[in-house]
């Protein structure tokens, strides 16, 4: 009996495995249908530099091909932790020579190609750029979308002398070691909530790296600036909760001028107290009359409904008319 059952079980298991292998790959980012375009291929991506990607919180990476008649384009997407990580990936993976675009707050274009961020997604389109309406159709389908403000640290980089596409956003020891190994993670103290923005500058005597480290409070920055000051070959400055570090500067004057351009600008917002609106007595009286009138209408409607029910019951259902109950106090009996 067991021998008879063995062959069917083996065949069923083989069929199940074959079905699983033959089943189409399930997409984690790109939908099957995008407007009039149909997805014709899907590829899961496994990027290198796993330590950096893990620090940026990479969740999914996919490349898909879409077609609509003769029109065909390729879409690559990365989903990471949040908008800060999306900024870091955008700076790291951006193509060289592309121009700024208005597709989003962080966007580049090059002919029919686009590269931009949307929330915690980084998207690259090659061969066709859908219009705003079609892009919105994609955005509402993106799973686990998270929106938030971009970090303000990149805005503190001096513009003069900045090498294009040299910016790299640092979220921890792995990305710091990958992009600027001359600065030790122990000096940065990422466990205190630090983030950093680094960039390259051209001086008359060679390239210079500027690293801006941001901390939750000025007190933390004041403590860590002492650690950076212990390093050799660097020039350090603290401004507010931010530390500026120049690395590899062979031109001392250029390094000093570069540091002088870095100044923390606090962004403070508050709600102004507004004078309470005094009620208009005419409106108050009018509202009271409206409410009283509404109560009268409701009372009349309820009374008419009850009278209608009693009339219908007596006329068609044979309800007997009950005598009116009379309450007697019998006060004369107590005399």
Task: Briefly describe each language-model feature range.
Residues 1-6:
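N-terminal secretory signal peptides that target proteins for export/translocation
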Residues 8-20:
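Bacterial N-terminal signal peptides
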Residues 19-209, 213-335:
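Soluble, non-membrane globular domain cores that form compact, hydrophobic packing
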């Amino acid at each position: 009996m067991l021998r008879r059952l063995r062959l069917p079980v083996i065949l069923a298991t083989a069929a199940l495995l074959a079905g699983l292998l033959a089943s189409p790959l399930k997409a984690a980012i790109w939908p099957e249908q995008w407007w009039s375009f149909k997805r014709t291929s899907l590829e899961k991506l496994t990027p290198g530099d796993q330590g950096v990607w893990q620090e940026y919180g990479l969740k999914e990476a996919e490349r898909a091909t879409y077609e609509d008649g003769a029109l065909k384009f390729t879409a690559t997407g990365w989903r990471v932790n949040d908008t800060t990580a999306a900024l870091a990936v955008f700076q790291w993976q951006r193509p060289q020579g592309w121009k700024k675009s208005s597709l989003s707050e962080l966007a580049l274009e090059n002919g029919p190609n686009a590269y931009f961020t949307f929330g915690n997604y980084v998207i690259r389109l090659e061969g066709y750029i859908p219009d705003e309406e079609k892009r919105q159709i994609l955005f509402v389908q993106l799973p686990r979308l998270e929106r938030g403000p971009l970090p303000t640290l990149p805005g503190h980089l001096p513009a003069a002398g900045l090498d294009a596409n040299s910016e790299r956003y640092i979220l921890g020891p792995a990305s710091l070691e990958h992009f600027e190994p001359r600065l030790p993670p122990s000096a940065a103290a990422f466990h205190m909530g630090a983030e950093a923005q680094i960039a390259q500058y051209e001086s008359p005597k060679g390239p210079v790296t500027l690293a801006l480290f941001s901390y939750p409070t000025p007190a933390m920055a004041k403590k860590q600036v002492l650690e950076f000051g212990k390093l050799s070959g660097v020039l350090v400055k603290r401004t507010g909760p931010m530390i500026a570090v120049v690395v590899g500067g062979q031109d001392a004057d250029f390094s000093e001028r570069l540091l002088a351009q870095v100044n923390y600008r606090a962004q403070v917002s508050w709600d102004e107290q507004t004078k309470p609106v005094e009620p208009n007595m005419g409106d108050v009286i009018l509202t009271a009359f409206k409410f009283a009138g509404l109560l009268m209408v409701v009372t009349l409607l309820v009374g008419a409904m009850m009278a209608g029910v009693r009339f219908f019951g007596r006329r068609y259902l044979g309800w007997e008319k009950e005598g009116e109950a009379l309450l007697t106090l019998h006060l004369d009996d107590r005399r």
